[in-house]
Amino acid sequence: MNYFELFKFSPAFDIDTAVLAERYRELQRAVHPDKFANDTEQQRLLSVQRTAQVNDGYQTLKDPIRRAEHMLSLRGIDLSHETTTVKDTAFLMQQMEWREALEDIRDSADPQECIDELYDSFAAYRTKLTKLLTAQLSSDSEEDALLAAVQVRKLKFMAKLHDELTRIEDALLD
């Protein structure tokens, strides 16, 4: 299913999430199972299925990584169950630096400063990746689509690192 069509968007990485939320509410009202409570069993089942599609579409389009994955899947590149690793040497070196920094937080004289620096570093790198991804996804080139898949893989890794940093910060606050 093309969630961009469902929510009446042109396929694009940058979408207005406020408009997305508004269209989500409109679709929810139109297909909500309560609206079909007195209809046939088949109509009620279709309503439940349609509601699930609307919910999944909304969750997909509101999350930038899932949105990018969806755009790529519409172009025949499925990353949803993929285990391919990034082979970019510079990125691998950066990963190692971040991992070392994560390990060093607890022994640091000022753990919060280290955490803040890592959050800033992650944000800067995500911004860089997002700019590349936006340009690559707006292109019709197969090569750019494959490069966009690489950026998505990197962003997925960044999301995991961010979650790990958040867990470390939470543990230090306990």
From Swiss-Prot:
Family matches, as InterPro entries: DnaJ_domain, HscB, HscB_C_sf, HscB_oligo_C, J_dom_sf
Entry keyword Chaperone: yes
Gene3D superfamilies: DnaJ domain, HscB, C-terminal domain
GO cellular component, one term: iron-sulfur cluster transfer complex
CDD domains: DnaJ
Pfam families hit by this protein: HSCB_C
SMART domains on file: DnaJ
Subunit structure: Interacts with HscA and stimulates its ATPase activity.
Family: Belongs to the HscB family.
Function recorded in the entry: Co-chaperone involved in the maturation of iron-sulfur cluster-containing proteins. Seems to help targeting proteins to be folded toward HscA.
Protein name: Co-chaperone protein HscB homolog
